[in-house]
Amino acid sequence: GKMSAEAIAFSVVDANGKVVSVGDTDKKFTMQSISKIIALMVAVQENGEEAVFKNMGYFGSDKPFNHFGSLEITGKPLNPMMNAGAILTVSLIEGDGETAFQKVLKMVRFITKNNNINYSEAVYLSEKETGHRNRGMFYIMKNSGLINGTEDQLDNYFKQCSIEVTAEDLAKIGYFF
């Protein structure tokens, strides 16, 4: 279901790792683009920084997160925090089927020390059903040879964006980085 607009929580982790939270700390929400940094970490861990950034940029951009004009102009995504780059990033994580997603989920659980974290099936299915722009980016990159796998890789991206966390989990992720 949808998150209540009235729900609010605030969590911080101090320099000693102590978590302080107030508000609706048990309310879960999906990570969406926050998951991109975790997938990037897994991809770099497996492949090395040079291999990951061989086919995408790493500089900031003033373009919207779902911009993919650079794929037509330069032939590669602007950076891993934009959707095209994030889709390419998850395609670099080794394994078939949902293995890449499971690695991202495992890393989120490790960082947060919360093995109960999972993804929202409803949000995943909605993203999969309506993610035409992302699907277009996937196929442009597949057509140009940046991506060699199947649409399972795109599904992994939709699933990673659907991982549900709480404000405390997110504060722990911020503390980790």
What is each residue range found by the language model?
Residues 22-23, 155:
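Short amphipathic alpha-helical segments at helix-loop
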Residues 26-28:
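A short acidic/small-residue loop/turn micro-motif
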Residues 33-35, 39, 81-88, 133, ...:
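Catalytic-loop motifs flanking and including active-site residues across diverse enzymes
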Residues 3-5, 13, 31-37, 61, ...:
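Generic structural signal for well-ordered secondary structure
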Residues 43-160:
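Active-site-adjacent helix/loop patches that line small-molecule binding or acyl-intermediate pockets
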Residues 160-177:
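Long, repeat-rich segments with strong aromatic
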Residues 1-22:
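A short, well-structured edge-of-sheet supersecondary motif
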Residues 17, 30-53, 173:
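Active-site SXXK
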